[in-house]
Design a protein with these regions (language model features):
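Polar/acidic, low-complexity leader/linker segments enriched in S/T/G and N/D
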Residues: 1-24
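Short amphipathic beta-strand starts and helix->beta connectors
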Residues: 27-36, 136-138
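Short, conserved charged micro-motifs
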Residues: 56-62
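Extended beta-strand solenoid/passenger and fiber regions
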Residues: 63-144, 168-202
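A surface-exposed beta-strand-loop module
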Residues: 138-161
């Protein structure tokens, strides 16, 4: 298994920077017009962590976490504090936040996702105990696989019924370097160079 179901400790993530990137291929024609296309259906997130760490204990904790992941070898969960809810960052998740499917009278399994305008982002790493589901706005019983983001309802929703969910989630990432660097500035403090993370598909 190339993914460890463990989250980077929050104290090591505070002060991180980053965001989503897209890959766009642009060809400029002889006429001056452009032809643009993208091989990616989903954006990919990148982050920098560790640059604000000064405590030797925190630096040691990040080093230990890095070693346990074998550098770039194993993925892990990362809490992006700017985007980790099914609702707005300042809100509280509700079961009607995100539409995750339409019932057909037979199907009971649905995959969590979050809408960004017309773009749907698959949510593969929901937080255990945070997922709520609803059918046509009414709360329903559901089981959740927190390793895949698959929701299984106790009963199949009727045809055309709207299935929705609310949740917290982590972003699956890996280290994007096989090396981290730190310097000792006093007996009990130091400085760590920023460590890159990159979102992975799971």
């Amino acid at each position: 298994m190339s993914f460890h179901e463990v989250r980077l400790p929050a104290r090591l993530a505070f002060g991180s920077s980053g965001g989503v990137e897209r890959r766009t291929e642009v060809v400029t024609l002889a006429s001056g017009y452009e032809r643009r296309s993208s091989p990616w259906t989903q954006g990919r997130r990148r982050y920098l962590i560790g640059a604000n760490l000064r405590s030797l204990d925190d630096m040691a904790a990040l080093t230990a976490f890095f070693e346990a992941r074998r550098g770039r070898l194993y993925g892990f969960r990362f809490r992006d504090f700017a985007d980790f809810k099914s609702c707005a960052p300042s809100g509280t998740p509700e079961a009607t936040d995100q539409v995750i499917g339409i019932g057909d009278g037979v199907r009971r399994t649905f995959e969590l996702s979050k809408a960004y305008g017309e773009v749907l982002r698959p949510i593969r790493k929901p937080v255990e105990g945070s997922v709520m589901a609803a059918v046509n706005g009414l709360a329903v019983e559901a089981a959740v696989d927190v390793a895949t983001g698959v929701v299984t309802l106790a009963a199949a929703p009727a045809k055309e019924a709207v299935v929705s969910a609310g949740f917290l989630f982590d972003t699956p990432v890996r280290f994007d370097a096989d090396r981290i660097e730190a310097s000792l500035e006093s007996f009990d403090a130091g400085r760590m160079a920023a460590v890159p993370l990159i979102e992975i598909r799971v």
